[in-house]
């Protein structure tokens, strides 16, 4: 397993961390002195993004901040290289020396844009990040961007990611990000190989390209929660673009009917979820 060594910063807080919801699948995750930016997309409301295959989507909700508003970021964790997950603003304004952990496909496409520090992961592969006492193990989780083989072949590969935070050898917190996956059988392997997930960030929205749904609906997102069994779940990626056909209300309705023990929390753009750890 390769190791990314980050410069040690100021004294880190290992008692709690936070997830700041910027919009779509863009979050800022901070714990133990490590700051992670996920799926950076900063287009303004009303602007359009190219999703490929001649399909464009309009941004419907303004992101909570812009790149210039961010604190210092240590690395980017990217589900895949679609325009609503790494948009032209991110490509233009983000520091191109930032490490990017993603699929082989995404890392290959970001290189020509100047992002030369890519760390590609296949499913179940891991990369270790160290910063002072903090250790972050990032493992690629299985993702499937479409339920039928023909559509999946047209779309790019997608990863979920498991973030295991530790202080030295003491494991403190486990966070799962679904990425833009559909429901599929390999999600059951996540619960089997990686139980005790503390927090799940669940990509929903029912993204529809032409007539094909390529991300989970709200109801399917709740089913993913039931399968992976995080202690707490937060739905994201639910209302930002015109191709989303399943809003947050669909998730809420299904969550109310679910018998899962998971606590569900809801974040609007610009809100923060603070979590406490075992350490």
Per-region residue spans from a language model:
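Metallo-beta-lactamase
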Residues: 2-14, 69, 102-173, 256-271, ...
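Pre-active-site segment of Zn-dependent metallo-hydrolases
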Residues: 6-11, 34-78, 88-93, 146-152, ...
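Short, hydrophobic beta-strand segments that form beta-sheet elements in well-ordered domains
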Residues: 18-21, 99-103
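Active-site-proximal beta-strand elements of phosphoester/diester hydrolases
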Residues: 18-21, 35-39, 136-143, 174-180
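Divalent metal-coordination and catalytic microenvironments
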Residues: 29, 39, 80, 87, ...
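Structural motif
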Residues: 34-36, 74-75, 99, 136, ...
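Active-site metal-binding loops of divalent metal-dependent hydrolases
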Residues: 40-42, 81, 141-144, 179-181, ...
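Cap/insert and terminal regions of metallo-dependent hydrolase folds
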Residues: 59, 99, 105-108, 181-271
């Amino acid at each position: 397993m390769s190791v990314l060594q980050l410069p040690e910063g100021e004294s880190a807080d290992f008692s709690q961390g936070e997830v700041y919801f910027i919009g779509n699948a863009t979050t800022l995750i901070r714990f133990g002195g490590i700051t992670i930016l996920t799926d950076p997309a900063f287009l303004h409301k009303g602007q359009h993004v190219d999703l490929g295959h001649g399909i464009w989507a309009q941004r419907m909700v303004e992101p909570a901040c812009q790149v210039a508003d961010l604190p210092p970021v240590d690395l980017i964790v990217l589900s895949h290289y679609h325009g609503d997950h790494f948009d032209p603003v991110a490509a233009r304004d983000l520091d191109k020396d930032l490490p990017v952990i993603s699929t082989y496909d995404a890392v290959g496409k970001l290189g020509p844009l100047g992002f030369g520090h890519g760390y590609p992961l296949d499913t179940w592969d891991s990369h270790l990040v160290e910063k002072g006492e903090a250790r972050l193990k990032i493992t690629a989780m299985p993702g499937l961007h479409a339920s039928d083989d023909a559509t999946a072949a047209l779309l790019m590969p997608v990863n979920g990611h498991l973030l295991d935070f530790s202080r030295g050898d003491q494991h403190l917190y486990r966070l799962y990000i679904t990425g833009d996956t559909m429901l599929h059988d390999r999600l059951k392997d996540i619960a089997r190989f990686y139980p005790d997930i503390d927090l799940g960030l669940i990509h929903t929205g029912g993204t529809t390209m032409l007539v094909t749904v390529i991300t989970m609906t709200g109801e399917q997102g709740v089913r993913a929660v039931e399968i992976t069994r995080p202690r707490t779940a937060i739905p994201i990626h639910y209302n930002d673009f015109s191709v989303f056909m399943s809003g947050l209300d669909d998730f809420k309705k299904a969550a109310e009917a679910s018998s899962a023990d998971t606590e569900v929390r809801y974040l609007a753009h610009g809100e923060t979820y603070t979590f406490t750890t075992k350490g």
